[in-house]
Every structure is written in structure tokens, then in C-alpha cells.
Amino acid sequence: ARRLLQVRPDARVTVLEKEEALARHQTGRNSGVVHAGIYYVPGSLKATLCRRGVSLLKELCATHGIAYETCGKLIVAFDEEERAKLRNLYERATANQVPGVRLVSGAELRDIEPHAAGLEALHSPSTAIVDFVAVAEALASEVRAGGGDVRTGARVTQLKARGTQVVARTPSGELTFDHLVICAGLHGDSVARLAGANPDPRIVPFRGEYYLLRPERRHLVKGLIYPVPDPRYPFLGVHLTRRHDGEVLVGPNAVLALAREGYGWRTVRLGDLAGTLAWPGFWQLARAHWQMG
């Protein structure tokens, strides 16, 4: 929305947010890491957008006075098998032009993280942390400043065509648009279905659970410490993450959520769960990764 108004200042842009405030879900419920582009296949869209996104995010944070802490990241190998995987990651990182990335010995990694230990590590000094809630609010402020509208509490319950236009029904009434862009996060497939579009890729909700280090133990972690990821699984593994507010997270795991917005074990929405269990792709995923639990 912000970019559209920059390119087309005469456009009338409206953002519909179903919650009463911004960043209530994925945007505000992550570890706050700004990844540098280490893991992605060189030349892929993910790699390209990651590096471009880092540049744009730094500019936005500087403009709005949002703290952008370049704390750095270590990916630590503990044995020879992991060391081989680590060197493959290093090759990817250099191909993706990640700034300053290098391999460090076990002794050198202790200079960076005195309380860490390992055989070898990949050091990415440009990896950063940021408050993504503040980022979302800054983007919304620019949309409003550019003449756009950001409406909270505007859950879209119906989409229908009316001639060449699209009509969106919300609790406050109907809104008519010439064009509609769906960016609905965990509900992306269901909102796409409302629009009559292909709902693939389908959403299977997983919840990541973290521990917090006690305040008197936070000094043990200066930046970000990750394991070498297992390429057989679609997760980066349990890691140590310093946040923008000074807290240090340990995690996450990845457990099947019983609701799309299921942030605790007791949150169960039968419609969401039934949708997951009825989709054949979920069972393919389960068969492929059942050993992880």
C-alpha cells in the first residue's frame, strides 16, 4: 500500500485489517530477526527479496527512528557432518552477497559469543533485530500520510464482483474497489477462496513455543546463536535470540496448532482443525516429518 501510493500518489488506497490494532499475529509474534539471506538458493526469488528487503527496512527504520540493532549471528557446527553442511551454507551466503559473512574456528566463535562452544561457526555480522510492531505502525503512518486509509476492525466476510469492480463486506458495511490485493497471512488461502481464487498454497498452522532466559542470565547471549539446520526438515532448529527489548528467547519448537490463531494448547477451533485434517497435503507433510514428533 505504501509503495503504491509512492508510485501513484493519485490512487485511493484502503488497507483492511481485521484486528483492532496492527501486527497482532505473525508480524508481531515472531522473534524479530532481520535475516541476511544465508539459507536461500542463490538466484532464487527468496534470496533476491531478502537482500532487497533488508535494504528497504534499514531505510524505513532510519526515517522513523526505529532501533535497528545489527547484533550479528552465529550458526554453530558441533561435529564433522554439521561442519560440511555449514560450509555449504557459507557458499550460499557468499553467492547471495551477504555482507561480511565468514567461517570462524571454535576459538574465534568464543571471541564473538564467550559462552558458546562448537567446532566451527558461520558468522553473519549484518544479521539484525528490530521491533516489527513498530515497523508495521510506521508503514501504516506513511500510508495515511500519503492519503491512504488504514481501517482496523475491518474483517472481510464476503467478496463479490460487481461489474468490473470488487465489493468487500466488513462489519461496518460494503466497500467497493477497482482492484483487490490479498495479503492475509494465516488466512491467505481462506480469503483467496472468498475471492474465487485458487487457495493454494494451503495454510497448515504450526505454533512455535519459546522459553525466556531469566534476566540474570541474559548476559550469556550477546546476539543470535543458531544450530546448523537439518535440510530434511523445514525448520531452522532451536536457537538463542536476543530481542529488541533485551529479552533472550530459547526456541522455538514447532507443534501443530489446533487453530489458525492458536497461541496456546487450549485454543481449539474445530473449523480450522477440520480443514487441516481434511486436506491430503497435511497427511503428506505428516508422513514426511513424523520422526520430528
Which stretches of residues belong to each language-model region?
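Glycine-rich FAD pyrophosphate-binding loop
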Residues: 5-29
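Glycine-rich active-site loop/strand segments that organize a redox cofactor
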Residues: 23-53, 64-68, 108, 257-292
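Flavin-dependent oxidoreductases
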Residues: 159-268
